[in-house]
């Protein structure tokens, strides 16, 4: 008698159920996340200076820094905001990219309140002049004068006109050169028009967005300008492209976008 091998009905049901479950898993993965193992925090990693010690304590200190961060050469880390700044003890963290959960001492030097003493100017040593030696004459050096920021009202966007700017940063000024909460002003020279001053944003916001600037850097973007003052006044940037990053700074009504993340402009304090 010929006997035929017949699959057990329970096995066939299990094979069909596993196939359906696998198909549903593929569909759900495609709908909700193309790569469930991807770490989306990599795009939020700020640029770092070469040679800095890794502040991580969760295993990332064993990784190559360039896997997540843009590594800036140490020689190029000059000017305001380069590297890490010393902070006063008790200062709230301005970061919004996850670094606010880290210990401040991992990257910054903590300075105790009232421990910074004012340094007095040392008196120059007397110089003996011999007969016939010409006396030194004072030399006048023309310094770049930063235009004063104009009070911006609710209708400032109606009297100002938008324009595009690009060029090399000649100098950096503003309260942001002394405090992380202050605004950064940059003077741009495009080689054609007279140099112009542009108010970017508070230093902490530029750090968080990855758009730190320094003299000699080429930047471009859009800004608002008072047509009655032309290049003699202070312009207000809507966006800036620096370090390969495009950062939005203000909306169409000249409102700073840092206000949406809880920041306070130093000029408004």
Curated annotation (Swiss-Prot):
CC cofactor note: Binds 2 heme groups per subunit via the 2 magnetochrome (MCR) motifs.
MCR (magnetochrome) 1 (motif): residue ranges: 48-71
Chief location category: membrane
MF GO annotations: metal ion binding
Heme recorded as keyword: yes
Description of the deletion phenotype: Slightly reduced magnetic response, produces chains of wild-type magnetite crystals sandwiched between irregularly shaped, small flake-like crystals. Small crystals are in magnetosomes, but some have multiple nucleation sites. Phenotype is exacerbated when grown in NH(4)(+) instead of NO(3)(-) medium. Deletion of the periplasmic nitrate reductase operon also exacerbates the phenotype. Deletion mutants probably make some hematite crystals as well as wild-type magnetite crystals. Loss of magnetic response, considerable decrease in intracellular iron.
Short sequence motif named MCR 2, residue ranges: 87-110
Topology in membrane: Single-pass membrane protein
Localization annotation: Magnetosome membrane
Induction record: Expressed in exponential phase, peaks about 18 hours. Protein is associated with magnetosomes as they start to develop, maximal protein is detected early then decreases (at protein level). Second gene in the 4 gene mamXY operon.
Cofactor(s) for this UniProt protein: heme
Sites where the protein binds heme 2: 104, 107-108
GO cellular component: magnetosome membrane
Record topological domains on the Cytoplasmic side: 1-10
Family affiliation: Belongs to the magnetosome MamX family.
Record's function text: Required for correct biomineralization of the magnetosome, maybe via redox control. May function with MamY, MamZ amd Mms6 in biomineralization.
Miscellaneous comment in the UniProt entry for this protein: This bacteria makes up to 60 cubo-octahedral magnetosomes of about 45 nm in diameter which contain membrane-bound crystals of magnetite (Fe(3)O(4)).
Protein name: Magnetosome protein MamX
Higher taxonomy: Bacteria, Pseudomonadati, Pseudomonadota, Alphaproteobacteria, Rhodospirillales
Gene coding for it: mamX
């Amino acid at each position: 008698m010929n006997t035929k091998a017949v699959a057990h009905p329970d096995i066939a049901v299990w094979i069909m159920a596993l196939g359906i479950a696998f198909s549903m898993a593929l569909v759900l993965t495609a709908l909700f996340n193309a790569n469930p193992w991807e770490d989306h925090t990599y795009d939020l990693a700020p640029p770092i200076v070469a040679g800095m010690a890794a502040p991580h304590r969760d295993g990332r200190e064993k990784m190559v820094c360039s896997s997540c961060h843009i590594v800036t050469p140490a020689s190029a880390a000059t000017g305001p905001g380069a590297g890490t700044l010393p902070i006063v003890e008790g200062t709230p963290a301005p970061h919004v990219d996850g670094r606010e959960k880290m210990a401040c001492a991992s990257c910054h030097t903590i300075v105790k309140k009232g421990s910074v003493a004012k340094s007095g100017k040392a008196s120059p040593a007397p110089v003996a002049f011999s007969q016939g030696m010409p006396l030194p004459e004072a030399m006048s050096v023309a310094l770049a004068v930063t235009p004063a920021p104009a009070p911006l009202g609710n209708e400032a966007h109606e009297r100002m006109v938008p324009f595009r700017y690009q060029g090399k940063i000649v100098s950096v000024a503003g309260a942001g050169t002394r405090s992380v909460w202050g605004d950064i002003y940059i003077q741009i020279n495009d080689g054609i028009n007279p140099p112009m001053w542009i108010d970017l944003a508070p230093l902490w916001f530029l750090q968080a967005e990855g758009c730190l600037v320094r003299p000699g850097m080429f930047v471009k973007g859009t800004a608002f300008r008072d047509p009655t003052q032309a290049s003699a006044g202070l312009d207000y940037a809507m966006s800036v492209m620096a370090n390969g990053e495009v950062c939005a700074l203000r909306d169409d009504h000249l409102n700073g976008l840092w206000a949406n993340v809880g920041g306070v402009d130093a000029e408004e304090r």
